[in-house]
């Protein structure tokens, strides 16, 4: 099995941006958000179950899953949220582990918002936390996702709090500033961590 670094952080912490920097250096990326889209592609078994359960209201005009609409629905209703999580989380976990077994490259970056909550941390040799203040998360998510503030607060409440997440961290990248102001520092940190992970991966072989 490859050397695995779990990359996690709350909503709008910059996980994808930083994961892409690692990818450019040669790390293999397995991203839970991408896998979550793959398992509900139009016509797939899970897609059909979701449409059957929630109805046409969760579809776009192109007949694909409207993830924003679905998110609004479930965060207002704990029963529906549990139903969807019980359907999706095992499927996402299975697919991520399949991709992990097939992974090639010096090491794997396991990009998972709910790494701790869904106990995927057990597959990681190291945990990298992208750390952001809650007020920064909220402001970014409001701008990026165009969701209402209640929905975003609901997402944040469903994730472990900042201090709990940090308690699991082996490595931390602080990402509170706008990208234009912090890009050079982030790239340097990623480069240093990449070299460190290469060394650890070699030692594991």
UniProtKB/Swiss-Prot annotation:
It catalyses: 3'-dephospho-CoA + ATP = ADP + CoA + H(+). Pathway: Cofactor biosynthesis; coenzyme A biosynthesis; CoA from (R)-pantothenate: step 5/5. It is found in: Cytoplasm. InterPro entries: Depp_CoAkinase (IPR001977), P-loop_NTPase (IPR027417). GO terms for cellular component: cytoplasm. Its main location: cytoplasm. ATP binds at residues 12-17. GO terms for biological process: coenzyme A biosynthetic process. PROSITE patterns: DPCK (PS51219). One of its GO terms (molecular function) is dephospho-CoA kinase activity. Catalyzes the phosphorylation of the 3'-hydroxyl group of dephosphocoenzyme A to form coenzyme A. PANTHER family: BIFUNCTIONAL COENZYME A SYNTHASE-RELATED (PTHR10695:SF46), DEPHOSPHO-COA KINASE-RELATED (PTHR10695). NCBIfam families: dephospho-CoA kinase. This is Dephospho-CoA kinase. It comes from Haemophilus ducreyi (strain 35000HP / ATCC 700724).
């Amino acid at each position: 099995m490859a050397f695995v670094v779990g990359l996690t952080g709350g909503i709008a912490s910059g996980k994808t941006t930083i994961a892409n920097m690692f990818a450019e250096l040669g790390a293999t990326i397995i991203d839970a958000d991408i896998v979550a889209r793959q398992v509900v592609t139009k016509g797939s078994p899970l897609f059909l179950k979701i449409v059957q359960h929630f109805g046409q209201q969760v579809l776009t005009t192109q007949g694909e899953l409207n993830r924003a609409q679905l998110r609004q629905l479930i965060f207002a209703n704990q029963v529906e949220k549990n139903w969807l999580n019980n359907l999706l989380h095992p499927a996402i976990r299975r697919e991520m582990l399949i991709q992990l077994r097939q992974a090639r490259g010096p090491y794997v970056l396991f990009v998972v918002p709910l790494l701790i909550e869904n106990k995927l941390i057990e597959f990681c040799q190291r945990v990298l936390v992208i750390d952001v203040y809650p007020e920064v998360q909220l402001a970014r998510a409001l701008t990026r996702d165009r969701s209402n503030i209640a929905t975003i607060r609901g997402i944040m409440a469903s994730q472990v709090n900042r201090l709990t997440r940090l308690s699991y961290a082996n490595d931390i990248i602080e990402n509170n500033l706008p990208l234009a102001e912090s890009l050079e520092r982030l790239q340097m940190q990623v480069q240093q961590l990449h070299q460190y992970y290469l060394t650890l991966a070699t030692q594991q072989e």
